[in-house]
Amino acid sequence: MANSSAGSAADHRNKHLSVNPPHQIFKDIQGSDNAIPLSPQWLLSKPGENKTGMGTGDPNQYGNHSDVVRTTGNGEETLDNLKKKDVFRPSLLDAESGRRDRWRDEERDTLSSVRNDRWRNGDKDSGDNKKVDRWDNVAPKFGEQRRGPNDRWTDSGNKDAAPEQRRESKWNSRWGPDDKEAEIPRNKWDEPGKDGEIIREKGPSLPTSDGDHYRPWRPSQGRGRGEALHNQSTPNKQVTSFSHSRGRGENTAIFSAGRGRMSPGGSIFTSAPNQSHPPGSASDKGESGPGEPPHLRYSRMKLLDVYRMADTECYEKFPDGFIEVPSLTSEEPTDPLALCAPSSDEVNVLDAIEKGKIVSSGAPQTSKDGPTGRNPVEFSQPRRIRPAGSREDMTFGAEESKDESGETRNYPDDKFRPEASHEGYAPFRRGNEAPVRELKEPSMQGNAHVQSASPWRQSSGGERSNRNSHDWNDPSADSRLKSSDSVWSHPKDSINHLGGNNMMLPQSKGESRWQISEDPSLRRQPSLVFDREQEVRKLLPSSPEELSLYYKDPQGLIQGPFSGSDIIGWFEAGYFGIDLLVRLASAPNDSPFSLLGDVMPHLRAKSGPPPGFTGAKQNEFVDAAGTSAFPGVGKVHSGMGETDMLQNDMRYKHVAGTVAENRFIESLMSGGLTNSAQGVQGYGVNSSGGLSLPVTDGGADMYLLAKKLELERQRSIPSPYSYWPGRESANLMPGSENVSENAQQPTRSPSSDLLSILQGVTDRSSPAVSGPLPAWSQPIQKESDLHHAKTFQTQIPFGVQQQRLPEQNLPLSGLLGQPMENNPGGMLSPDMMLAAGLSQEHQSLNLLQQQQLLLQLNAQTPLSAQHQRLLVEKMLLLKHQHKQEEQQQLLRQQQQLYSQVFADQQRSQQRFGDPSYGQLQASLDALRLQPSKDMSQVNQQVQVPVSHEERGINLADLLPVTHATNQTVASFETPSLHLQNQLFGNVDPRMVLPDQIDDTHKKESKSEYERTVSADYVNSLYSEKPVLSPGYHATHNVEEPVSYPNNESSTATMTAPEIVESKLLEEQSKDMYAGKGEVSIELSGETPATEVKNNDVSVARKTSEKKSRKQRAKQAADLAKSTSRAPLQETKKPQPGSADDSEIKGKTKKSADTLIDNDTHLIKSSTATASNTSQMSSEVDSVRGEESSLQNTRTQPGRAWKPAPGFKPKSLLEIQMEEQRVAQAEALAPKISSTVNSVGSAAPWAGIVTNSDSNILRETHGESAITQTGVVKPESVPTLKAKKSHLHDLLADDVFAKSSDKEREVMEIISNNDAFMQVTTTNAESFDDDNFIDARETKKSRKKSARAKTSGAKIAAHVPAVDTSLQTNSVEKGKSSRILQQQEKEVLPAIPSGPSLGDFVLWKGESVNNPPPAAAWSSGPKKSTKPSSLRDIVKEQEKMTTSSHPPPSPVPTTQKAIPPQAHQGGASWSRSASSPSQAVSQSSSQSKSKGDDDLFWGPVEQSTQDTKQGDFPHLTSQNSWGTKNTPGKVNAGTSLNRQKSVSMGSADRVLSSPVVTQASHKGKKEAVTKLTEANGFRDWCKSECLRLLGSEDTSVLEFCLKLSRSEAETLLIENLGSRDPDHKFIDKFLNYKDLLPSEVVEIAFQSKGSGVGTRNNTGEDYYYNTTAANDGFSKVGGKKKAKKGKKVSLSASVLGFNVVSNRIMMGEIQTIED
């Protein structure tokens, strides 16, 4: 029966697959009498059978299955029903599988054509049914829901790998009473729709042949859950089911039946999803499939019947050749999910699946992304994340390679995935399962970054890597896997360390790994790797298609021989992955099986993970396949973190693991990696160890060797760097060897030096770089390396650092990842960027200490505390010594390097010399391409790995380094000219590298040497400002400056350099992307001040360091702006050479613009960096003094883009500090009140600010730039302005480019509205100052936006205004603008375009200038403005209306005066700025009394117009009201500007602001004020109702006004809660309800009918107004209802009728209204 079924099915379906084992398996699976019909073991046997059944014995399966089913008591449902079910079920399953497969096909183009066709042909039809079946298990929606989950698994599986894994495991288990999975998952799934599903399975007899044939493969990967089982191709797919406990039984059979794809892992994973289909279902499908051998697929019903009818104990016997894998199998049969109540986790998952929250197993499925599976990024990113868990990451790399095949992953996933997927499903995995789950959980911990599925996968991946490589190769591998599971139980812990420490725990990892490696499977794996490698070599024929291969299915059964073309076809069809264990038919029987990817490396590029799994990226495959492998070739540059690099390396290593392992072992033998063995264990597991790990196949032995060697060496080498070396050496050696024999050696040499230095094995690593490095003394190299490593470490965030500490090895691994680029530090650069702000030195020490401790604790637990202490002490001593030696030697050597590099840099600068970033980028790209050359050269020239790495550094690293150096030079050198345009072009990255090296070393070892170097170097740079380019000249002169530092030490200057260094670190990455020169220019401009203010600089440095940390988030945005503007400012700064600076400004603008044109992204990055630097510079400058501020006053054509959105506000402390500094700096130059000139500009800015922060910033920056450039403004003014508003300038700078154009337009508008703008700005400024404080209050978001607007305007105004108050304001502006921008970014989107309660509140606040506005609700200290205060305010407003000009005269008068005079605005600004609080209090009291009420509910003009103009213009028509001039109106204008910012352009705001002022003049009586408030409130309610309910019917709101707050809140939540999930509107409304006087509320809705009747459908409104006048409720409810023409009766209910009220309260009003 098995044979016949196998014959027919295999012939029909698995044309190339011999499914004899499947026959056997099918036999087991055929009947419930089989020992393990539903158990995972049964499923596992079933895979072989499924192969038979699916491939050959599908009809037999059905026949057998029918028999079995009949035997189980499904006689009626036996073959016929099964066929029906199977036909239907297979269709569903096939469809689902097909969908997964289809994803897989999509993932794999080759598969997609076949599978998609198949799926389209039969899978579609049956797929839905199939899904129904599956869903039957889950819910009444049998077909769709079930399928939906699969689809989700398939579709979303990629998104949610972990959920899908869980889900798949559940599906798999639910398909059969897997011992583990079936318990709950299966019961869970089966129970809900087991009957329906069975019926579906039986009933829908969709032509399974169609679906089955094309689905089978797809299911193995795409279906991932029972689908694969159902696909006839599924046998292969189901082969994957073996690995998963989920669909184990069915998929397993299919797997064994499945084609070679059933190779360990890939097909297993694939089958795991497939397994989700009940084996019977698969049989049914196969049976139903015409011409298809009845697969041993039971419909769920039949499976359940089998389960019910058969004694599960009889199935406890495992099929012959069945390998018990704890993670995949349970000692005892598990109840089908249909029979078992799902666990709470399962229930949650099921619910989530039904709700669509979980659309996939959560496994990183790449099925959607193409044959390879996902975007390489998709999978690599989880992997990328994985670097944390070196094992898993490494294994994950291997795993990914396997994932490429999909089956490898699937299989290990089956083992681990169940764990992972079952992590939440403990019941799924009983017994052994738990350890793996635990393992995976640690793995997940380590790889928390990775998708949840990815983490478990990682853990399983480690296992899988081993197992996939070998265990998966053999049935014995499974046994090993079992033992491996035990081992992995250890690894579990180790993985916890691995994942948790992210390769920092070489010991825990290493021990676990070593345990694992000690574990037979692990031990076996290394040899397997070698054997496989050898075998692969043996196996590889001239033409893969010509090969005759046996493959080992997950059952461990040898299938075949099959032609290579068949194997390839199956592989492409997704039946198995590159991890399929194959052996040449001609190979001896005892010859080891090799991975298909090894035998057919070209398939690696094609291999894709199962649909539910993120497959290794094609890059990985390429890397794996082309073990040449620059895993980071594209990926490192693609911005992968070192983690990604690690993953790439791991990937690569896994692929190239055999070769790399050999090399690694050789290196270990050579001792080069001896310490790296620790790295191998700790990080190496991910890095070099990871190389071994991914290569865990041979890595276990390597790790053992490395571990022993490393431990011995590390023990022998107390220096903490021995640990570093271990890690880095591991990284370097394995990475270098793995990644590139070619490019990696040069990369390696610096890395080796680094590693050796870190390891204390300088000689060891230096030999790699022996040729070029000899120039450098080992100690120096060591120091450089140490510093470089530190830099990398410090650059690396600590969170990342743990991952990276191993990944610090990533610098090495980066080398590995970047060997292509020979950019050992290339990967680090991102980290460097990340940690740039951190004190490199401290970070380095901390990292070294932490890493060393971790390494010692983890990898070298044997090390005694003394050793650890010694290591730490030695590390510190070494660090100190290295600092000193490095300082000295690096100074000398760097001088040499600088001389050498300078020539190189000149050449390279000539290469890069083009100021344009595009060229620079090209040059950088060239550097990346040239790194091997340059790297070798640099390595030769500069042993300091930093140099090498920097040269080889990725663009990111190179740029950051270059920026750092350039910035350092720039900071030290005033010539911002050179830096701006020449930073990239002129400064050779290599030159920069030496500088950066100096900086880095200085940073790392903040010895006086660094300080001296920094100070003296800076001084020399200053003296050398004429240098063509800071980089060039600096580098050129660096030799001298370096010697200077050696001889000289100006602590103060040094402090500035340190600050600069920290900045540079930040800027390095930042400038790296943006015009490096700009930031450098900024710094260079600052340098004199730095020297001048050494103490300040020290403070500033500290502050900068703090900020750098704090600002990192906002540095990106701020520095982006700062970079744009700071360079401009520097250019503008006439410090050392104002002419040059101005030239630079032009150049910078060009350069910045060019950079923008060339690489906006880089510009953004550099801008962000520059912003940070600029902020830091501003701080430093403020600290340093006026000169600094002047220098900082650089108007750089900021980047066109707006970094503001990403801009992160500084902490209040930072802001306060900045304000203080700015205040000081501005106080130094309060003289510049002439900045009023820019106030005119600023006025528009106020309007623009309301428009958008970026606009404000842009325009403000443009304004400041314009003011500086075009407006009559002393440079001291720009300086002060820049200093004051440096932060906002930073924000505005990048905007400047855009803003300059916009600004010109705006300036024209401003010129027209200068006075008003100034007034508005003044109000905004005053308001903003308070807003800055009060903006965070209850109306925080609104105030944020308003504040952002006003603050933007204020900033714009402040930029021009140089008053101390303005300066402080500008500081606050900068801060508040940043905050406001952030807040506004947060808030503005939420701000309704029309008048909103927030707008009213904001207007109030703005009009009042934050303190009063805060009172609007309870948000501010000004809460006094509550109903009573509103009334008072109304009265005051009336008074103010009558005498509105005088009361607000302080601000408004100025404003009035200002409108005519943009420059006089300075006075008003001075006035408001000098006493913003006074102006605020005045205008706030005045405009609050009047404007607040008006503004609270809307612009005062609105009320006025409503009363006077009758046509109450909306906010968008504020220009109408804008004609009114009243301080209150000005405030209103400000608020209006805010609203306009939401809805109107800056021009409109600008125009409307004066108009608003006029509107204020129209004066309003208290009634008018109340009416205005009422109208504003009503309009706001309408707008909100329209927004939330889609209609202006405010009946609910009116009714709520009649209710108590709690009742109203309840009602509103009932009615609007779904539409206002955040309850923002509800809260606002309730606040208004509480704050508004009852009369205002009455007026609001009466006026709706009457007062605003004309506006609000007067007829109805009046009609209801009469009613409203007579009856409040009638008025309230009836009016609005009447307006709608709906709910008139409802309005009656609104009037208070309980029935309707209850309905309303029930939220039915909305329904009724709708």
Curated annotation (Swiss-Prot):
Superkingdom of this protein's organism: Eukaryota
**What did gene disruption experiments reveal?**
Reduced size with a curly leaf phenotype associated with an abnormal constitutive PR1 expression. No spontaneous lesions, but enhanced cell death independent of salicylic acid (SA) biosynthesis or reactive oxygen species (ROS) production during pathogen infection (e.g. P.syringae and F.moniliforme). Heightened nucleotide-binding leucine-rich repeat protein (NLR, e.g. SNC1, RPS4, RPM1 and RPS2) accumulation and enhanced resistance against virulent pathogens. Enhanced snc1-mediated autoimmunity including stunted growth, increased expression of pathogenesis related (PR, e.g.
The GO terms describing molecular function are: mRNA binding; translation repressor activity
Answer yes or no on keyword Repressor.
yes
Tell me what PTMs the record reports for this protein: Quickly phosphorylated at Ser-39 after treatment of seedlings with the pathogen-associated molecular pattern (PAMP) flg22.
Q: Which UniProt keywords apply?
A: Cytoplasm, Necrosis, Phosphoprotein, Plant defense, Repressor, Translation regulation
Q: Which residues carry this modification: Phosphoserine?
A: 39
Q: Which residues form the GYF domain?
A: 546-597
Q: Which InterPro entries match?
A: GYF, GYF-like_dom_sf
Per UniProt, the ranges with Polar residues bias are 58-75, 230-244, 268-278, 444-463, 737-753, 1163-1180, 1515-1544
Description of how the protein assembles with itself and partners: Associates with eIF4E initiation factors and the ribosome complex, thus likely contributing to the proper translation of target proteins. Interacts directly with RPL18B and eIF4E1. Binds to SMG7.
Name the record gives this protein: Protein ESSENTIAL FOR POTEXVIRUS ACCUMULATION 1
Q: What gene, per UniProt, encodes this protein?
A: EXA1
